[in-house]
Amino acid sequence: MVLSQRQRDELNRAIADYLRSNGYEEAYSVFKKEAELDMNEELDKKYAGLLEKKWTSVIRLQKKVMELESKLNEAKEEFTSGGPLGQKRDPKEWIPRPPEKYALSGHRSPVTRVIFHPVFSVMVSASEDATIKVWDYETGDFERTLKGHTDSVQDISFDHSGKLLASCSADMTIKLWDFQGFECIRTMHGHDHNVSSVAIMPNGDHIVSASRDKTIKMWEVQTGYCVKTFTGHREWVRMVRPNQDGTLIASCSNDQTVRVWVVATKECKAELREHEHVVECISWAPESSYSSISEATGSETKKSGKPGPFLLSGSRDKTIKMWDVSTGMCLMTLVGHDNWVRGVLFHSGGKFILSCADDKTLRVWDYKNKRCMKTLNAHEHFVTSLDFHKTAPYVVTGFVDQTVKVWECR
């Protein structure tokens, strides 16, 4: 940088003042002579302490610049990742923000599953302590405990009205609870091993369950009878989930596959095999996301003119995969977690994917650009489960350290 003659003269006089006032007489004399300075009292007063002032000002400005750069980078990140720009951002783009709103304690063993009630402002957690707990997610208050299972409760599911809750357990049973009276109204026996997953079908008439006995069973809600058994997996079936209209169910297993079954015929419609380890979790894409998925992946539209259905899977191979069920093709693989992926689901707005893992993080993915856009260091221990509220701006996570956390989205 080139200084003007005036700036150079001011700098030289400030240096001369600094040398003289700090006792560097010899250096002052030499510098004054070489810089050809004509010093007098008036000028001396003007430049007294000027060099020190300039120096401290530069340091102060540097600090300010660094702070502003940091804020600018944060603002850029918020802008690109759907952050809070006043209240103008579309709620469909709201994502969880740290810190958590509540950290809820009460379970005496690791939390295995967390879900929101479809109607009321409550959420439910299941645990290895054999209990199910009900919490108010708006106030953080504990409401009640449902007891009945004799071993770890592995999964829970509401019907669409929220009047019935299904649970399954390592005690090899499935229980149906009246969520208005909080009583167990039915217990179903039939699996020969740990029942790892349960889901109430969209019509509310049937329940599906998956087990370590390698089977998937369908049960009648009214009678508790097992009406269908789906066989094909070669190892422990980890999770089962029905699609939106209940015509298909998806399952994932220790055999490293994801299978899609036609409910009416029990036929295995697709066997999806690209994971390299146990597949822990699956989630169907909501129909609201079909067009953006098709656009992001370039997947072909079927003869019917409708894209999809699409499915997500998370695995111990640390990846998340998106599948086109109609073709059996893996559309994308999301890489970023550093440990087993334990939960995955679509954001209710359809544009993002949320996941949790044993790397202690909760992540938000922009699948259109195939990148992780937000990482929340959720806890000091493994994150076992997550759920995203369909209408309210909340995410809930469960942890191995026995706690449940509620996150606000904005």
Swiss-Prot record:
Gene3D superfamilies on file: 1.20.960.30, YVTN repeat-like/Quinoprotein amine dehydrogenase
Primary localization class, coarse: cytoplasm
InterPro entries found in the cross-reference section: Dynein_regulator_LIS1 (IPR017252), G-protein_beta_WD-40_rep (IPR020472), LIS1_N (IPR037190), LisH (IPR006594), PAC1-like_LisH-like_dom (IPR056795), WD40/YVTN_repeat-like_dom_sf (IPR015943), WD40_repeat_CS (IPR019775), WD40_repeat_dom_sf (IPR036322)
SMART domains: LisH, WD40
Coiled coil: 56-82
Top-level lineage group: Eukaryota
Gene Ontology biological-process entries: brain morphogenesis; cell division; establishment of mitotic spindle orientation; germ cell development; lipid catabolic process; microtubule organizing center organization; microtubule sliding; nuclear migration
Stretch list, region Required for self-association and interaction with PAFAH1B2 and PAFAH1B3: 1-38
Region called Interaction with dynein and dynactin, residue ranges: 83-410
WD repeat ranges per the UniProt record: 106-147, 148-187, 190-229, 232-271, 274-333, 336-377, 379-410
Pfam families referenced in this protein's UniProt entry, alphabetically: LisH_PAC1, WD40
A cellular component annotation (GO) from this entry: microtubule associated complex
CDD domains reported in the protein's UniProt record: WD40
MF term (GO), any: dynein complex binding
Region (Interaction with NDE1): 1-66
Interaction with NDEL1: annotated span: 1-102, 388-410
Keyword Lipid metabolism in record: yes
Subcellular location: Cytoplasm, Cytoskeleton; Cytoplasm, Cytoskeleton, Microtubule organizing center, Centrosome; Cytoplasm, Cytoskeleton, Spindle; Nucleus membrane
LisH domain residues: 7-39
Alphabetical list of SUPFAM superfamilies matching this protein: Lissencephaly-1 protein (Lis-1, PAF-AH alpha) N-terminal domain, WD40 repeat-like
PTM annotation (Phosphoserine): residues: 109
Other facts noted in the record for this chain: Originally the subunits of the type I platelet-activating factor (PAF) acetylhydrolase was named alpha (PAFAH1B1), beta (PAFAH1B2) and gamma (PAFAH1B3). Now these subunits have been renamed beta (PAFAH1B1), alpha2 (PAFAH1B2) and alpha1 (PAFAH1B3) respectively.
Family according to the record: Belongs to the WD repeat LIS1/nudF family.
Purpose of the protein: Regulatory subunit (beta subunit) of the cytosolic type I platelet-activating factor (PAF) acetylhydrolase (PAF-AH (I)), an enzyme that catalyzes the hydrolyze of the acetyl group at the sn-2 position of PAF and its analogs and participates in PAF inactivation. Regulates the PAF-AH (I) activity in a catalytic dimer composition-dependent manner. Positively regulates the activity of the minus-end directed microtubule motor protein dynein. May enhance dynein-mediated microtubule sliding by targeting dynein to the microtubule plus end.
Protein name, entry field: Platelet-activating factor acetylhydrolase IB subunit alpha
Underlying gene: PAFAH1B1
